[in-house]
Swiss-Prot record:
Its EC number is 4.4.1.14. Induction: Hormones, such as auxin, environmental factors, such as mechanical wounding and a number of chemicals. Keywords: Ethylene biosynthesis, Fruit ripening, Lyase, Pyridoxal phosphate, S-adenosyl-L-methionine. Pfam families: Aminotran_1_2 (PF00155). The lineage of its organism: Eukaryota, Viridiplantae, Streptophyta, Embryophyta, Tracheophyta. Catalyzes the formation of 1-aminocyclopropane-1-carboxylate, a direct precursor of ethylene in higher plants. Residues 474-494 are annotated as: Disordered. It comes from Cucurbita pepo (Vegetable marrow). This is 1-aminocyclopropane-1-carboxylate synthase 2. GO terms for molecular function: 1-aminocyclopropane-1-carboxylate synthase activity; pyridoxal phosphate binding; transaminase activity. One of its GO terms (biological process) is fruit ripening. InterPro entries: Aminotransferase_I/II_large, Ethylene_sulfur-biosynth, NHTrfase_class1_PyrdxlP-BS, PyrdxlP-dep_Trfase, PyrdxlP-dep_Trfase_major, PyrdxlP-dep_Trfase_small. The keyword Lyase applies.
Amino acid sequence: MGFHQIDERNQALLSKIAIDDGHGENSAYFDGWKAYDNNPFHPENNPLGVIQMGLAENQLSFGMIVDWIRKHPEASICTPEGLEKFKSIANFQDYHGLQEFRKAMASFMGKVRGGRVKFDPSRIVMGGGATGASETVIFCLADPGDAFLVPSPYYAAFDRDLKWRTRAQIIPVHCNSSNNFQVTEAALEIAYKKAQEANMKVKGVIITNPSNPLGTTYDRDTLKTLVTFVNQHDIHLICDEIYSATVFKAPTFTSIAEIVEQMEHCKKELIHILYSLSKDMGLPGFRVGIIYSYNDVVVRRARQMSSFGLVSSQTQHLLAAMLSDEDFVDKFLAENSKRLGERHARFTKELDKMGITCLNSNAGVFVWMDLRRLLKDQTFKAEMELWRVIINEVKLNVSPGSSFHVTEPGWFRVCFANMDDNTVDVALNRIHSFVENIDKKEDNTVAMPSKTRHRDNKLRLSFSFSGRRYDKGNVLNSPHTMSPHSPLVRARTY
């Protein structure tokens, strides 16, 4: 029996959480990661491997952080220059965290939001990354079985982060492409009514702003609509703002903190902000998650719960010094935004040349790519078939829209900031060859007699690189040939 199998004896011995598959590891979202892990692309060691485009990571400005650390060795307690503070930092720290870190974080959060709002360091609660912070807030607000309304498409791992251990439920607020997936009051009310009809107690609304996977920002009117909605129903509003410094073009980012300060009759105790340094600074391995709540009880309880997932004092010490360097922070935020904008513009421009459009976005480290025209029919089954071809034959790990609970098949999230320029070139060349091959086969299909064309209506999904002409001088553009009947990963169909 393998690690992924649970026999009858263990089903009787273990807890419901232990035997439950609520983690979602068997979803298409995580299956794509497994495909990459089993066959990772490397320009020299494995040029025919899978390119990771399913990881929402920002590596474009990583060198700036490395340079700062080189210039400030005293910021680390593990260097000769910083060793004198080793004992005081390495000894026991309570769950409030280092005061200098909370102060630096509050200042940084304000700077990211253009200085239009200030944050109180005493309200900052730390957790083990955004995942831990998210779960802690849910534990504070909901009992098992309670529900949260979440506009879809939404972050695929919310099903794990928000539901698995808390036993809370998610009710999607369905948004569609006709208005660029914007949240409306009508959609909120429909979802709320649906929860009531299912005898579920709605405890709040959860949004990501900027949006993952859309890469768009909420405007002030929509944020005010959300605040009004939760005020009327006396439920909570959780705003995940972990991508707030990834905005690279207009409109600028508006934090819910600004709306809270400006709106009259706002019930502040219902508003909670999630933040992290994983996306804005590109430091997911540091596991820095932040809860900023306007509710005193939530602040107190979340701080006590943070004992189960603290940020190491060594990490706090280093980041306190870095985030307190205002000149560095100003330069980093400006340059990071510039680099993200340039990468996004280049990536979408090349896709557009191939006839592939993306949702117009202004933030994030990904694009919401529209491949509806490549589906053999407008179903999620067809989307999964196309996704398997992209994973197994084109060798790109992109995430299918169904993983994000979108209502329209054919959308894919594609990350562009977790790789260097050369890898981007390889990925774009693979996409170009794939689309070109499909278009050629489609042209041939149109030229066939009607009966033959009917028999060949699956040409769109029977793609193989074996018939391509390769540039022998550029082996990086030549993925493994793989039979469409031998999928590398087991994907879930909807």
